[in-house]
Design a protein with these regions (language model features):
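PP2C/PPM-type serine/threonine phosphatase catalytic domain
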Residues: 1-229
Length: 229
């Protein structure tokens, strides 16, 4: 077995007064492990990797990626997205969510990955149905408004559980606890307590225009491949 060196890091958070252990792997073992953990794959013309080397299942990978080619009336649109689940550092609740115990924070990112792409596709389909060649600003508005509306709907779902503040004030602690821990209700609450970044790229059928939508601490980079590289 290859010899490894163990070191510590503060992960860039010196104020937390905590250190994490990690192993410095030599080559070729480093490349071998990176290849094994990255789950490298190709989907059509898109190459993807995703990895979280931490072995603790409670902090398993919260990244999700979506690769879709949408056949719409004016041609095929290329949709690519990355969603990264986010956890609040402080979850200060007067009532403990049963589902939160041992929770890794996947509810929101799973919901976003499963539903936001289809929501954007439907909104885009309506636009190109009426205008076969929408201008760039129209597509930008579709992305912006759809993402904003989707985010608002997550919050509205929570408010439907307690629509009347006066009625809520009259509920006992047990009654509130029973509501928030009632099956789907706890998932609705967790989606608001947790979160997800959004990074989307969209290319039109003629491949002449590219749109990028970014929400949260994520960024997209663009490069150009030379012939033979």
């Amino acid at each position: 077995m290859s010899k490894t060196t163990r070191k510590t890091t503060d992960m860039g958070w010196p104020d937390l007064d905590a250190l994490w252990m990690y192993n410095v792997l030599p080559e070729p073992f480093l490349s071998s492990e990176l290849s094994r953990l990255s789950l490298a794959n190709s989907i059509g013309d898109t190459d993807v990797v995703t990895f979280q080397p931490c072995p603790n299942p409670d902090v398993s990978n919260e990244d999700r990626f979506i690769v879709k080619d949408w056949s719409l009336p004016n041609g095929t649109w290329s949709f690519r997205a990355i969603f990264d689940g986010r956890r609040s550092r402080v979850l200060d609740l007067p009532f403990q969510l049963n589902q939160l115990l041992g929770h890794a924070g996947h509810e929101t990112v799973d919901y976003v990955a499963s539903n936001l792409p289809n929501t954007i596709q439907n909104a885009l389909a309506k636009v190109v149905h009426h205008n076969n060649a929408p201008d760039a600003s129209t597509i930008s508005n579709v992305l912006t408004s759809t993402i904003a509306s989707f985010d608002e709907d997550i919050g509205k779902a929570l408010l439907t559980l307690f629509p009347d503040p006066e009625a809520l004030a009259k509920l006992s602690d047990k009654e509130i606890r029973d509501i928030i821990n009632d099956g789907a209700n706890s998932t609705t609450i967790l989606r608001c307590m947790l979160g997800s970044t959004v990074l989307i790229s969209l290319v039109n059928p003629s491949r002449t225009s590219l749109w990028i939508a970014s929400l949260g601490d994520c960024a997209a980079g663009m490069t150009k491949c030379s012939m033979g590289d």
